[in-house]
Design a protein with these regions (language model features):
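Conserved ABC transporter NBD signature motif
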Residues: 300-308, 317
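Helix-to-loop junction immediately C-terminal to a conserved catalytic motif
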Residues: 292
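Short intracellular "coupling" helices and adjacent cytoplasmic loop segments at the cytosolic face
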Residues: 8-32, 36-38, 111-135, 225-234
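Primarily ABC-family ATPase nucleotide-binding module
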Residues: 128-130, 225-275, 279, 460
Length: 468
């Protein structure tokens, strides 16, 4: 139950953590925590009874031996405490090495991610593949091997030291018993009892590094600084009666980097079809994430119908949007408005409008796909977002991966259809041939936002590159 709660709570915390923070962490540390750290805590939870059993038996046996001879018990306890103290010094090195191993694990997960996600690029460049394999993977794997050997060496040293001292304690028992004038029977009872206790004590010592590994895992999870655990999701119904969204004197900055957005002012009216153009790196995608509430402005104000968007209502505000970003993840489960089952007639309509009827099959409300091109994947993402039936649809260079014929269909046919359905469209685009289909044309230039007047729009349509 403990491990179940930890796993589910960790996933919920990731869901509730601001996207910018998760992006900064990267997927490798999160995957390492969800796999390696959870596994370490699971193992520790299984080994915990051994430690508890060893402690309880030691206390019970101590009371029994104390009834036979307190002086002899105190001397043996001093012997055992000394043994444990030295073992603890050895185990301290185990903990230090386990902490280092956990850091190496993060690096290894990054290497695995590079090998899997960069497989096409690596296949085309064997020099890069060799460098990744030798300079990164082999180096990290070697560091892991050496560090785990060190940790195991200290652990085995602690176990062997405990074994030797426990057997030596038997000789001490008979020597001290003779010195104190105790009977041979009492000395034999002490010796046999100590031999009986050897296994539980060694099991407890063996379980201790596992518990230390779990402590390292907990420390690593806490170092992620994820959002506090909240069992509930935002369930408030979306208010579709909004009229305008305003950005006033808005700045955004990634941690200690230069300002990405500078004094941005924008009013987005319901039903608008807005195109945003600009050079690569000008801040277009960042503006999109701030507008949708995914990123929190560094300065300035985001508001809807005059109501400021704050931490208390930002999650509810985000429910107004469906978005397709450049790194869109496609979920196979289709979801309709407010999380209800999708309208299948709407699904099939858009499946045909997006020319996916021969590429994607739909079983129930789940997508079943063969291999799709990048452009077809973007169309599939469009299908999943349209059936959500959100008020605002944001598309980040969605048409860039479409062939010329379907790009024309998108601008000349799909955009008017979505507008007729009452959707507000915010589209990041470089397609200067289709700027006339926008109600408004915005230009992002070096972090600043400019709305183009009719004359500037003509120039942008004639030669978009010169405007950037």
């Amino acid at each position: 139950q403990f491990v179940y709660q930890l796993r589910t709570q960790l996933v919920k915390q990731i869901l509730d953590t601001p996207v910018a923070q998760v992006d900064h962490l990267g997927s490798a540390p999160l995957m390492a925590s969800l796999s390696t750290d959870i596994q370490a805590l699971t193992t520790a939870f299984v080994r915990m009874p051994e430690l508890v059993q060893g402690i309880i038996l030691s206390l019970a046996v101590s009371l029994y031996l104390g009834s036979l001879s307190w002086p002899l018990l105190l001397i043996i306890m001093l012997w055992i405490v000394t043994t444990i103290w030295i073992s603890t010094l050895l185990v301290k090195h185990v903990y230090q090495n386990l902490t280092h191993i956990r850091d190496i694990n993060d690096a290894l997960y990054q290497d695995y991610q590079a090998v899997i996600e960069g497989r096409k690029e690596l296949a085309l460049n064997q020099h890069r593949a060799k460098n990744l394999y030798i300079q990164d993977l082999i180096r990290h794997a070697t560091a892991y091997k050496k560090t785990i050997i060190k940790a195991d060496t200290y652990h085995l040293s602690a176990v062997n030291w405990s074994n030797i001292m426990m057997f030596a304690a038997i000789g001490v028992i008979f020597a001290v018993a003779s010195y104190l004038g105790l009977s041979l029977g009492i000395a034999t009872t002490f010796a046999l009892t100590l031999l009986f206790m050897q296994s539980p004590i060694l099991h407890a010592v063996g379980a201790y590094p596992t518990l230390q590994t779990a402590q390292v895992a907990l420390d690593k999870i806490q170092s992620l600084q994820l959002a506090d655990y909240e069992p509930q999701f935002v369930t408030a119904n979306t208010d579709n009666n909004w009229q305008s969204i305003e950005l006033r004197n808005l700045d955004y900055q990634y941690s200690s980097q230069d300002m990405i957005l500078k004094q941005v002012n924008l009013t987005l009216n319901k039903g608008d079809v807005v195109f945003l153009i600009g050079a690569n790196g000008s801040g277009k995608s960042t503006l999109a994430k701030v507008l949708t509430g995914i990123f929190t402005p560094t300065r300035g104000q985001l508001s809807i119908d005059g109501r400021p968007i704050t931490d208390t209502n930002r999650a509810e505000y985000r429910q107004l949007f469906s978005a397709i970003f450049s790194d869109q993840y496609i979920f196979k489960q289709l979801i309709g408005p407010e999380g209800n089952p999708p309208d299948m007639s709407l699904v099939h309509h858009w499946q045909h409008r997006l020319q996916l009827q021969n590429k994607v099959s739909i079983e129930g409300s789940k997508l079943s796909t063969d291999k799709l091109s990048q452009g077809q994947r973007k169309r599939l993402a469009m299908l999943t977002t349209v059936v959500e039936d959100k008020d605002i649809l944001l598309l980040d260079e969605w048409a860039a991966d479409q062939d010329p014929a379907f790009r024309r269909t998108f601008y000349q046919s799909l955009i008017p259809e979505l507008k007729a359905l009452g959707k507000t469209l915010f589209i990041i685009s470089h397609d200067d041939s289709y700027f006339e289909h926008a109600d408004r044309l915005l230009l992002m230039k070096q972090g600043k936002l400019i709305e183009l007047n009719p004359e500037q729009r003509k120039q942008a349509s004639a030669d978009a590159i010169s405007m950037l």
